[in-house]
């Protein structure tokens, strides 16, 4: 299966875009969609055979592999429904996140879809979204007497490589976090969590939803600091210049899923406070 999207595929999806425009301009009376909002396959000239290769790493609860070996998570469920409505097949590929751009450049994947922060990266990719929001927060070991960002002075903190927290902390742009003794950039969140458990580091930073799930399994050992490191918009990233109509179509589908409550319902199914998750608070 190819990671790139062919010219023929783009032509197929252009047909879909035309149908979407009709729907958005009030022309849905022509019965172009079914009752679930799915674009009819007969209008797409076989579009259902087209796949979208989605790259992400293991980042629970957004994207992860369950005990049966299946791809699951908030982003996975959103992607499955969005692709269903577009009439295409999602193919999930686990990647090394700090090599994400090389996967895009080599056409091994079509897009990055894994709690990926748009903020500060709007010119780097072709985006669909935002489709939800996130807070970047700091988790600390309770035995290290860290109760605020100021207490991170002289402490060891870990971040995921190429993440927004890595940039913020290494650049020193946040005046609230100064004088940390060391910053460790790790390839995966699993490595980060293991280092926290073993006490190799004092604190770490990441998406609140993922961090909270980890803390809930270890409430006696860890705390989440009250301060917010960064508020971000999450989106789906495509390489610029490659079938740019697809992000536009996906963007419209994601808006529909926000408006009809689908994304909120998916978030709630993972025990998430959906009002905050959707940016309502």
Please provide the spans of the model-predicted regions.
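Extended ligand-binding regions for polar small-molecule ligands
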Residues: 28-30, 76-85, 146, 150-151, ...
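Extracytoplasmic small-molecule ligand-binding "clamshell" domains
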Residues: 34-115, 185, 269
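Acidic, polar ligand-binding/catalytic clefts
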Residues: 80, 84, 89-151, 223, ...
């Amino acid at each position: 299966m190819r990671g790139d999207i062919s010219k023929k595929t783009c032509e197929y999806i252009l047909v879909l875009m035309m149908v979407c425009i009709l729907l958005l301009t009030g022309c849905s009376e022509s019965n172009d969609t079914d009752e679930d909002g799915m674009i009819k396959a007969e209008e797409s000239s076989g579009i259902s055979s087209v796949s979208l290769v989605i790259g992400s790493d293991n980042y629970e609860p957004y994207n992860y592999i369950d005990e049966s070996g299946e791809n699951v998570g908030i982003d996975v469920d959103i992607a499955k429904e969005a692709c269903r409505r577009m009439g295409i097949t999602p193919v999930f590929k686990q990647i090394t996140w700090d090599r994400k751009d090389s996967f895009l450049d080599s056409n091994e994947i079509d897009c990055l879809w894994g709690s990926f922060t748009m903020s500060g990266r709007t010119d780097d990719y072709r985006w669909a979204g935002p489709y939800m929001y996130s807070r970047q927060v700091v988790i600390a070991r309770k035995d290290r007497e860290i109760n605020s960002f100021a207490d991170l002075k002289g402490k060891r903190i870990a971040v995921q490589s190429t993440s927004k927290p890595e940039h913020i902390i290494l650049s020193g742009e946040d005046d609230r976090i100064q004088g940390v003794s060391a910053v460790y950039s790790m390839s995966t969140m699993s490595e980060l969590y293991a280092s926290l458990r073993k006490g190799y580091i004092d604190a770490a930073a990441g998406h609140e939803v993922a961090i909270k799930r980890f803390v809930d399994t270890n409430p006696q050992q860890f705390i989440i600091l009250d301060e917010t490191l960064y508020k971000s918009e999450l989106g789906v990233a495509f390489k610029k210049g490659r079938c740019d109509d697809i992000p536009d179509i996906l963007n419209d589908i994601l808006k529909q899923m926000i408006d009809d409550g689908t994304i909120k319902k998916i978030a709630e199914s993972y025990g998430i406070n959906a009002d905050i998750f959707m940016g309502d608070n």
